[in-house]
């Protein structure tokens, strides 16, 4: 059986002088403390990608930066699904007996570690290099296509989807580490 034993989160915003590895380290330290563990007890690490630190072996780079020597290290890159995918993979690693304590970590510092243009350029590379990138779609365009298809297949309206955004913001209001702290309405979303 596996379960989440600790959580750590850095605040959203500008972090002058801190790299994405530094932010990951701060969050990891908080998560380990919350779990009541010591660094030496971490025997697995899953590390999400960072557009500001685009290293092909980011999990091992982070492990070295953070000062741990896990027996299992894996970098995960599946866009917006990375957090959930890492959580699922951590569960599978524990259930399979590969690791007992898996640290799941990710972090970005785009507001201070990357220019606006560099962020847009990095995020514009998520499509197929031959069939999509030359046409110039961005991540919102991809999600728009998915939403349009979902609406078509399930009879959902734009207002229905707006209600979901309102619900997510309502939940975020109770979280001190949330990116946004003001409530929104369906009218706000639809504007």
Model segments located where?
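A short, structured active-site edge motif that brings together acidic residues
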Residues: 72-81
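Conserved beta-loop-alpha segment that forms the PLP phosphate-binding cup at the N-terminus of a helix
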Residues: 82-87
